[in-house]
């Protein structure tokens, strides 16, 4: 009986060529696993393509709701952003995909898991670290670190020689990753930072200059940091993300073009469309400013940098990540309320923020008199607050 290899399968270029390559080089039975995290693919066609490419079996795992509730909710609570711009769409999906690969490997009695990640990318680290955390005895096959195919063009040639249909051409050669949270575009002419990216590549965001000529308003109700309602309507988790993606996207919200520092040491350029995430982050951040006390708010900003880096690096199945998420759940206890945003041609403006848990008090914050705050109290506070600075200055003067 042949050994079984579980393959992380998307139907894209990298995994399209992996099935025949595995059969040619390892003489194994390939079990393809496509994890549906919201990519806009026809899953029946994905199944057909896997079988036509030589897979013995194909699993399609629909995990969109789990992706939202167990991963993206955490992203929103943290406003998790890598290096100030990247909303971690790929990074949050990888541990869930790895989890499903391990589950299928156990079900099939497979000793090997194969992925189509390139030897220069972050995903190879994310997948293999996650798999090792769940089953340290599963062996990894990583074709990009083994074969002599050294470019997208060569990969296409190999696929065509094996009769495998590929979704890209040598002219249109972007590598794309699509899920419910984002779509990324890398490779091709984007590899030269001098090249302006082409807006024709957009899949879910309307170019701002082509967006609606009238502003749109959207209100989001959060409960303990989690979005629950859009314009007063309660929606299921997946439907809510789809709704905000649509509204933000048609108003030109959510595209970033960035150069990032990869985990493996090099810099890379990508264009990311994250319409709904960009909108939800802005609304959530505004509500936090109203409802979270100063010390917790400031400490969360510091930890958010670490959390985002941890997720980017693929360290999801770790004690640190679990502990940080426990912390943010406590911080978010009072982050309940409604934020209304005005959207217009790629711009967002806060229209209103309301919460029963608001720590802002107009009576205290106004310039008028207040029973809780006497202007005269400020003098004593300033004297104490500035005391270290005064002492330091006095000591300097004594030495002159």
From Swiss-Prot:
SUPFAM superfamilies: Adenine nucleotide alpha hydrolases-like, Argininosuccinate synthetase, C-terminal domain
Class of enzymatic activity (EC top level): ligase
Residues bound to L-aspartate: 118, 122-123
Binding locations of L-citrulline: 86, 91, 122, 126, 175, 184, 260, 272
Catalysed conversion reaction: L-citrulline + L-aspartate + ATP = 2-(N(omega)-L-arginino)succinate + AMP + diphosphate + H(+)
UniProt: ATP binding residues: 8-16, 116
UniProt xrefs under Pfam families: Arginosuc_syn_C (PF20979), Arginosuc_synth (PF00764)
Subunit structure, interactors included: Homotetramer.
Name recorded for this polypeptide: Argininosuccinate synthase
């Amino acid at each position: 009986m042949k050994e079984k290899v579980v393959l992380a399968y998307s139907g894209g270029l990298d995994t399209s060529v992996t099935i025949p390559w595995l059969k040619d080089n390892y003489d194994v039975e390939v079990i393809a696993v496509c994890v549906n995290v919201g990519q806009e693919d026809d899953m029946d066609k994905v199944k057909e393509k896997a079988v036509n490419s030589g897979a013995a079996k194909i699993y399609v795992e629909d995990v969109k709701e789990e992706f939202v509730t167990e991963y993206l909710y955490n992203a929103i609570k943290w406003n998790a952003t890598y290096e100030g711009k990247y909303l971690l769409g790929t990074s949050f999906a990888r541990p869930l995909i790895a989890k499903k690969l391990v589950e299928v490997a156990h079900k099939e009695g497979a000793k090997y898991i194969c992925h189509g990640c390139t030897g220069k990318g972050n995903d190879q680290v994310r997948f293999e670290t996650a798999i090792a955390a769940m089953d340290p005895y599963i062996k990894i096959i990583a074709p990009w670190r083994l074969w002599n195919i050294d470019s997208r063009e060569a990969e296409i040639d190999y696929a065509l020689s094996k009769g495998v249909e590929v979704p890209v051409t040598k002219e249109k050669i972007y590598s794309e990753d699509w899920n419910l949270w984002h779509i990324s575009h890398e490779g091709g002419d984007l590899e030269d930072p001098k090249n302006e990216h082409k807006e024709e590549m957009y899949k879910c965001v309307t170019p701002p200059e082509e967006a609606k000529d009238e502003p749109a308003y959207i209100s989001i109700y959060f409960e303990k940091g989690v979005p629950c309602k859009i314009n007063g309507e309660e929606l299921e988790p997946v439907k809510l993300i789809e709704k905000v993606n649509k509204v933000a996207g048609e108003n030109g919200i959510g595209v970033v073009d960035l150069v990032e520092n990869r985990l493996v040491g090099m810099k890379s350029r990508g264009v990311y469309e994250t319409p709904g995430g960009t909108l939800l982050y802005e609304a959530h951040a505004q509500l936090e400013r109203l409802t979270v006390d100063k010390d917790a708010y400031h400490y969360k900003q510091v930890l958010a940098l670490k959390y985002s880096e941890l997720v980017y690096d693929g360290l999801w199945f770790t004690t640190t990540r679990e502990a940080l998420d426990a912390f943010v759940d406590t911080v978010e206890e009072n982050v309940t309320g409604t934020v209304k945003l005005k959207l217009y041609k790629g711009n967002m403006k806060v229209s209103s923020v309301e919460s029963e848990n608001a720590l802002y008090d107009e009576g205290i914050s106004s310039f008028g008199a207040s029973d809780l705050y006497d202007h005269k109290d400020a003098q004593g506070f300033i004297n104490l607050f500035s005391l270290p600075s005064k002492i330091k200055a006095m000591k300097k003067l004594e030495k002159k």
